[in-house]
Amino acid sequence: MAAGAVTSTAPAREKPRLTFWQIWNMSFGFLGIQFGFALQNGNMSRIFETMGAKTDDIAILWLAAPTTGLLVQPIVGYFSDRTWSPRWGRRRPFFLVGAICASLALLVVPNVSALWMAAGMLWIMDSSINISMEPFRALVGDLLPAEQHTAGFGAQTFFIGIGAVIGSLLPPIYTKWLHVSNVAPAGQISPSLKYAFYTGALIYFLAVLWTVVTTREYPPANLEEFKAEKRLHSGFWYGIRESFAGVVHMPRTMRQLAVVQFFSWLALFSMWIYATPAITSHIYHTTDTTSKAYNDGADWVNVCFAVYNGVSALAALGLPIIARATSRRFTHMLCLVSGGIGLISIYFIGYIPAEQTVSLHLFGSYTFRVIELVLLIPMLGIGIAWSSILSVPYAMLAGALPSNRMGYYMGVFNFFIVLPQMVAGVTLGFFTKHLFNGASIFTLVLGGVSMILAGLITLWVNDDDDVQMMPGGEPTENFGYGTPATRA
């Protein structure tokens, strides 16, 4: 615990088990949040290139995302821990403010007319998404008893997957099914991408609003003590100092998971930044942003992202089974290695003959290149890794944190999501230009190596809250179901 914190003397409230629909409602906002992230992650590099950015400059432009995360997430976590309104609760005001700002940003982004405007809007959009997203993690610890933590994080992972699938598919849906053009003159965003962002803005706001309206939060266990701590330690600069001081006072499990997170998110960020330039150049053999081939390739990147997010949602159902039979550490390692192999394999897919096509009938007749369909195979491994990244580290972490500092430490933990992204933003452009001679496909390979390394490091994490699961018994915490048995 960071210095200066008031230690609670009130007995911990015994939280009632929530019903399926209560967990559903409290997690539903993640559906909308992921629409925003899906559109951002799948299309900002495309927008940057359309506005004239060079491939090796894209990474530095993406610095907006991790920088805002570094500043916003721990501060929002800190102040949401110290917020209480009888009407609005603790986390819900942040959900609503972030949703309003993010939805407005999604409306503006596809109408930018210059590179600096696109970069600036990424700052605003990512900050807003972080404001509404960060307290959702803490809400699980606030409302759910320990034995339902995994169910809570699993529900969030499910909505993250579903939201990302539909959000990622919005541009190709408008292009393929609704026949909106995906090509525009130089320096302009295509109509199909504009409509995708407009749709995402509406869904983002409505989904988060649903959680705000349907979820009720518990007041602090000792309201007078809570008010005393708030008066003592509620200053803005105190909050910033406490947030960043949390890195020094992290529990052991949190420190170890931080290393795993670093290499995991370095890999993910390399994919989000360079998937569009890598696939359009290595698979579609073009860098002309006004060409149909480039925009078809950029649309297919969204399809790839939809597939890995769909796999993530399904994998979330199977991860507890694997963890029950083995351990959370082994499960996370296995998933990360699968994702790393998937990223590396994209390089080899580029050598499949590009002329072969196949016709599929799905809400109409469509012709695809075989290489496009094969490109979906690596997304299976990436989706499995993504599912684990979104749930297993948080399930491991929740048991190692004091309940009255849950939002605070969840915010601090996000440092190790944004720090590797900042490292990627500063270094990947240099590597792409000078090490890989501008071939961004090798940046994806580097990301795959980083993800495999993260998986291997997971085996050294102390997960004292995890237990071996035996068949049968009541639902328990620790990522599975069954009667706990002592681990040797």
Predicted regions and their residues:
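Loop-to-transmembrane helix entry
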Residues: 54-64, 191-192, 285-310, 373-377
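C-terminal ends and interior cores of transmembrane alpha-helices
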Residues: 95-114, 338-368
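Intracellular loop-helix junctions on the cytosolic face of multi-pass helical membrane proteins
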Residues: 1-21, 113-120, 129-132, 136, ...
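Helix-loop boundary and gating motifs at the non-cytosolic
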Residues: 8-68, 256-260, 264-288
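Intracellular juxtamembrane helix-capping segments at the cytosolic ends
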Residues: 131-144, 388-402
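A late C-terminal transmembrane helix in Major Facilitator Superfamily
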Residues: 403-434
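Helix-to-loop junctions at the C-terminal end of transmembrane segments
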Residues: 73-88, 314-328, 432
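Loop-to-transmembrane helix entry/capping segments in MFS-fold secondary transporters
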Residues: 55-56, 146-156, 298, 401-413
